[in-house]
Amino acid sequence: MLIPGFMAGDPTMKAMSSMLRREGFRTYRAQIWVNVRCTREAGERLEQRLETIATRRNRKLTIVGHSLGGMLARGLAARRPDLIEGIVSMGSPVLAPGAIHKVLAWDAQLLSRLTRAGFGGMMSADCFGGDCARLSWEESQIALDPDLAFTAIYSKRDGIVDWRACLDPAARHVEVRTSHCGMAVDPVVMDHVLAALRDQQLRRASLAAAPVDEVDSLRVVHT
C-alpha cells in the first residue's frame, strides 16, 4: 500500500505505483485525496483499509510511505505487526516530526486555523502540540517487530525535513540525492524501493521453503 505525504494525495504516488506494477507487484492506494486529516483519524482509516486488504489477500502487506505517509506507516507497523511485513519510508522525520521547514509549519498552522473556523476533518492544533501529537510521538517510539523489514530512505538535499530525523535506528538507512517532493518520482529512489520489496520477496520465499527448525535461524540472520 502506498501512503502519500502531508498535503498530498494518492495521485502523487501514481508513478511509484506504475513502476511497481510493471515489476509484478500488486499495489493499493491509501484512498487519501489530500493528506490533511487528523493523524489519529488517518491512522485508524488506514488500519481499517489494511485489514480489509490483508484479509482479502490472506497475507501481510508492505507499506511504502512518503514523508508523513512514512510516519503513518511506522505507527501502523507498531500497532499491527499481524498485518504488516515491511515498510519503506521516504523522507519521513519519524524521530522528530517537528524537524520541518518553516513553510510546512505555516501550512500546518493554516490547517489549525481552518479547523477552528469550523472546517472539520482536518488537523487541529491538538495534532501538532496536544494529546494527538503526544500519542503519535509515543507510538513512533514503540519497538517494532524484529521480523519487520524496514528501509528508511533519506536525502541530505531534502530541503523540507531534517534528514537526521529520518534515521530511525530500527531501519536500514539508504541515502539518495534528491529533493523532498522528488522522493516519490525519482528513478533512483524507485530503484531502492523496488530493491527493498524484492529483498522481502526473497526472504518470504526462504522462510516458506525452510524446514521449521531452520526458520528461527533465518530470522536471526535477517535481523
Task: Show the residue positions of the predicted features.
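Short, solvent-exposed amphipathic alpha-helical segments in soluble enzyme
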Residues: 17-18, 169
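Serine-dependent carboxylesterase/thioesterase catalytic core
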Residues: 1-11, 15, 21-139, 222
